[in-house]
């Protein structure tokens, strides 16, 4: 069945309808090798639809979920040491899904899982620089100097990070709760940033990836991502 191109592109999870219209206007969309125009229709089952040379297809058969990973679980599908794995929490998903990125065993919060390899690869590719936001708890009060250091580039495993966005959410004599947004996903990056700053990190929770927020999802629980959330993520990783 033929449908407007922007509707097909949106339903495939590539972009919102408005963004799809811009792709069409800019000549990035082809149907069967011919550059498409705004207002064109196509049949995704019989026509070859490409954006920047990449063929798009239906997304209905894929699964996309978010999990609130609790502390103490490893972000793997199995573990030779017998540690709790995230698979213990998603047995009722019904499909074999894989984590997009990682959270270390002692971190918690938002984790995306899917069986869509192309989607996962786009989301993780360094060129897209999707912002990841964490809440971090450190011992004691956080000084102005420490905040300035956290906002500066760090040398982590031979890689120079981009400046982070850091805000104080709560502070008392015993601890400070920070919001830290980073643009890379280096291994244990925030832990190493705190260590180099001289801060003792006691808790780390990822609360957002781009505009996708963990919200009120309880630890150990998962839910399917909405079509709107998938469109937002797709726009951010193009």
Model-derived features: where do they sit?
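Basic, flexible Lys/Arg- and Gly-enriched helix-loop patches that mediate nucleic-acid binding at interfaces
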Residues: 1-238
């Amino acid at each position: 069945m033929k449908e407007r191109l922007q509707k097909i592109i949106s339903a495939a999870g590539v972009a919102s309808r408005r963004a799809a219209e811009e792709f069409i206007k800019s000549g990035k969309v082809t149907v069967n090798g011919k550059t498409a125009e705004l207002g064109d229709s196509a049949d995704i089952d019989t026509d070859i639809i490409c954006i920047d040379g990449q063929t798009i297809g239906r997304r209905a058969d894929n699964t996309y979920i978010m999990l609130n990973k609790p502390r103490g679980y490893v972000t793997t599908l199995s573990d030779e040491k017998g540690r709790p794995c995230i698979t213990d929490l998603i047995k009722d998903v019904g499909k074999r899904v894989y984590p997009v990125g990682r959270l270390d065993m002692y971190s918690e919060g938002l984790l995306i899982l899917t069986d869509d390899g192309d989607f996962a690869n786009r989301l993780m590719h360094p060129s897209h620089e999707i912002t990841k936001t964490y809440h971090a708890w450190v011992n004691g009060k956080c000084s102005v100097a420490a905040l300035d250091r956290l906002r500066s580039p760090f040398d982590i495993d031979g890689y120079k990070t981009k400046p982070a966005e850091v805000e104080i959410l709560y502070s008392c004599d015993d601890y400070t709760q920070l919001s830290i947004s980073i643009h890379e996903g280096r291994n244990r990056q925030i832990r190493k940033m705190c260590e180099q700053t001289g801060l003792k990190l006691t808790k780390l929770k990822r609360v957002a990836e781009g505009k996708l927020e963990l919200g009120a999802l309880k630890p150990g629980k998962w839910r399917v991502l909405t079509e709107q959330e998938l469109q937002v993520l797709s726009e951010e990783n193009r």
